[in-house]
Amino acid sequence: MIGSNEMKYNYHTHTSRCNHADGSDEEYVLSAIEAGFDEIGFSDHTPWPYRGFVSAMRMREQELASYVKSVKELRDKYKDKISIKLGLECEYFKEYIPWLREVIDKFELDYVILGHHFTPNEQYGVYNGFPSCAQDLVNYKNEIIEAVDTGLFSYIAHPDLFMRGYSSFDKTAKKVSKEIILKSIEADIPIEYNLMGVLHSQTMGREGYPYGEFWKLAGELGATAVIGIDAHSPDSYTDYERYRKAEEALKTYGVKLTDKIKFLR
C-alpha cells in the first residue's frame, strides 16, 4: 500500500483529454482504490478561451463540461470507497483569470492548483521548464507571487520546475526559490514535491526537479509540502517506491508534509 505515513491523498491527476496522458478516468480511480488512497483529485490541464491558437497540451474548451460530468459521476459511483475532488491545473495568465473565476463558479470546482508552465503566455512565451536566462526565472517568480495573491490556488505545483533546464542553482535561482517559498508560507499554502519530475530527472540522467537545493532551502525556511503524483497514467498510483522515497526526501530536508489543502467550497 502507498504512503508510510498514512497520508493517502493525491490532488494532481490528469486525464487523456490533455493529449499526453493515458487511460480512462475510471481507471485512475480504480488504481487509486487499489493503492489504498482515501482521497484523490482530478486536476487536468485547464483549457483557456484561446482564439486562433490550439494548444497541444490541454483539453479544448468544449471538453470541459464532459470532464466535469465524468469526475462528478465517478465521485458518486465510488463514494463508499474513495473521496474524489474536482479541480484544474492552471497557469497564471492574467487576461484569463476572470474567465477562470466564472468556470470555478459554473462547474463548482473544489480546487485549482497553480502549475505555471509558461510566462507570460503559452503561444509566445517561455516554457518555464527550460528558461534561457536569469531574467526568465525572475519573470516566473513574479507571476507566481501575483498568482498566489489572487487567493484562487490551493497550492503551487512543481515550484522548482525551472531547474529542469536551468544550468545551475546559482544566485538568481536561490533568490527566486526563496521568494517563492516565503510566499507560500505567507499565504499558508503548500508547495508540491512533484513525482513526475522525478521521472523526468531519471530520463535526463541528471537532477532536474524536484531539485535538492530548492527543497533544502524550503526546509530551512519552514515550508509545508504536498506530494503530487502528477499522474499521467493509472499505474502512477501504484508506484509505491517513488511515493515512499518522496516522503523520505522531505523528511531529510526538514520539510513539513501535509495532506490538507484549502478547498474553494
Label the model's feature ranges.
Residues 5-7, 36-39, 80-86, 107-110, ...:
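Short, well-ordered coil/turn segments that N-cap beta-strands
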Residues 240-265:
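Mid-to-C-terminal alpha-helical segments outside catalytic/metal-binding sites
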Residues 19, 113-221, 237:
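Domain-core and long-helix interface of multi-subunit machines
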Residues 192-194, 224-230, 259-261:
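Conserved active-site loop/cleft motifs that coordinate metal ions or position small ligands
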Residues 33, 105, 148-149, 219, ...:
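Non-catalytic positions within long, well-ordered alpha-helices that form the structural scaffold/packing
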Residues 12, 32, 112, 158, ...:
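Conserved, mostly hydrophobic/aromatic
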Residues 1-94, 104, 166, 170-175, ...:
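An N-terminally biased module of ancient metal coordination in phosphate/nucleic-acid-related enzymes
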Residues 45-62, 111-129:
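Active-site gating loops and adjacent loop-to-helix segments of metal-dependent hydrolytic enzymes
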